[in-house]
Amino acid sequence: MVKIRIRSPLWYDGVDNAPHRSYLKAIGFTEEDFSKPIVGVLASWSELGPCNYHTLELAKYVKEGIKEAGGVGLAAPTIVVNDGINMGTPGMRYSLISRDLIADTIEAQFNAHGVDAWVGIGGCDKTQPGIMMAMVRLDIPAVYLYGGTAEAGWLGERELTIEDTFEAVGAYLAGRITLEDLKRIEELSFPSYGTCQGLFTANTMAMIGEALGLSLLGSASPPATSSRRRAFAIASGRAVLKAAELGITPRKVVTYDALYNAAVTLFATAGSTNAILHLLAIAHEAGVKFTLDDFDEISKKVPVIAALRPAGPYAMQDLDKIGGVPRILKKLYKAGLLRGEALTVEGETIGKLLDRWQPPPLPEAGVLYDVDRPYKPYSGIRILRGNLAPNGAVMKVGAAERLKFEGRAKVYDSEAEAFKAVASGEIKAGDVVVIRYEGPKGAPGMPEMLKITAAIVGAGLGEVVALITDGRFSGATRGIMVGHVSPEAAVGGPIALVQNGDRIVIDGEAGLLKLELGEEELERRRKNWSPPPPKYKGGLLAKYASLVQQADKGAVTSPPVL
């Protein structure tokens, strides 16, 4: 057994630390408590939306598990930026920034106070990768716990998610539904606290937590309102001390094989493209070489086996009813697509856990398919390259009916300009909407584009109009959408050189994103291009723009691990 009071003695043992003990005795510590491991409980709590509304309650259950296992739990908060509420507003510039801030705040709090281990509770999109980045950065025993998905809504026999509300706005603007129809969907689409209900970014990252081995097997799918969510909170508290006893730290878990498994799972479920950014960032923090080239190679081997929204009709709660994420992982493992020797925080390899796990005796009911008879015969996401994205771009082919598209560019230097064009009917079938200067440095913050992509789909243009951007997409995005174009426009990437009327080729099968111009013309335009002035001269956004790397590097702000 490994000594599990690995850091706290420096803070709390000995005569010279008597004042430190006084501080904790003031909040109820006993003398005996100082002989136990001190375990941080990170609650990403906020009332600024439903996603993290309940995490303080979950923290209490985590502390119960820690106490049962012989430790003392101390809760601490971090910030939350609710992506859905900020969509299409200046607030979205703070979304991706918050991921790195969350990792930084966790490092500051838990390193400053010498905790021996910790459990991180995440909910909304960026809290989860931020916590996972901090786990490998601190590299002390840690377990990730997801706050859980919201329940789906219902409109008669129609299952609703927040995706329906975003798309209903586009349908209303196009005259396809009435204002009363829109209001009914608005009222019914999000009936409980928890995260967005499809396999959007939050549920994707929760699934990734299981695939990486950072969270307990089966813990991703129970809804936020489920009693099993509280049971997993208690179990996570126990598990972190077991991991500490076994000497298991996150960098022993987040290896190349674990990242490989996460990528396979992402592609097999057509999960959020944001997960590629986040996995690149997690690998960066772990000091593991895992690049877009790895994603590209893996994507060529994996079909889509899950019919989860937005690629299919089902919500996360439907997956939960038939066994949750382990049912997906076991299919992939039995097909030889997962690397079973990857270690997990539970102290066993993922292969051993999956060998032991048995699905409930329920039919898959169209939610899941077999690898040899997939839902779609190709990967959910493809990496694109070409003269428009020399360093790469991503396309969620699993949520598009067409993998190939050619059209003429309509260029906008902000999402707001492009949204006005959609709302006014300026965008027509055959157009390729190009939205630029929305990348990591240019926006800054690489905002998501759900407001405009949902408007395009809602207007009935989802399969006849394409969109290309150096920004990001929500996990709820569907249609012919290409994002993360790198290099971005603000640093002189080729997307900055596109002009109205230029012909663009998108080929999701071949992995191609091409501007049909000769190199001489591109060079002429490049000589005439000059970078725009920074949008912010002070504050957090200016600091971020000065530090952030490009999307193909995970849009990270911290130096590499040596």
Swiss-Prot record:
Which positions are annotated as binding Mg(2+)? 83, 125-126, 448
| Reported cofactor(s) | [2Fe-2S] cluster; Mg(2+)
Which Gene3D superfamilies has this protein been placed in?
Answer: IlvD/EDD C-terminal domain-like (3.50.30.80)
EC top class, in one word? Answer: lyase
Q: Which GO terms describe its molecular function?
A: 2 iron, 2 sulfur cluster binding; dihydroxy-acid dehydratase activity; magnesium ion binding
Q: What does this protein do?
A: Functions in the biosynthesis of branched-chain amino acids. Catalyzes the dehydration of (2R,3R)-2,3-dihydroxy-3-methylpentanoate (2,3-dihydroxy-3-methylvalerate) into 2-oxo-3-methylpentanoate (2-oxo-3-methylvalerate) and of (2R)-2,3-dihydroxy-3-methylbutanoate (2,3-dihydroxyisovalerate) into 2-oxo-3-methylbutanoate (2-oxoisovalerate), the penultimate precursor to L-isoleucine and L-valine, respectively.
Family designation: Belongs to the IlvD/Edd family.
- Note the subunit structure: Homodimer.
Q: What is this protein called?
A: Dihydroxy-acid dehydratase
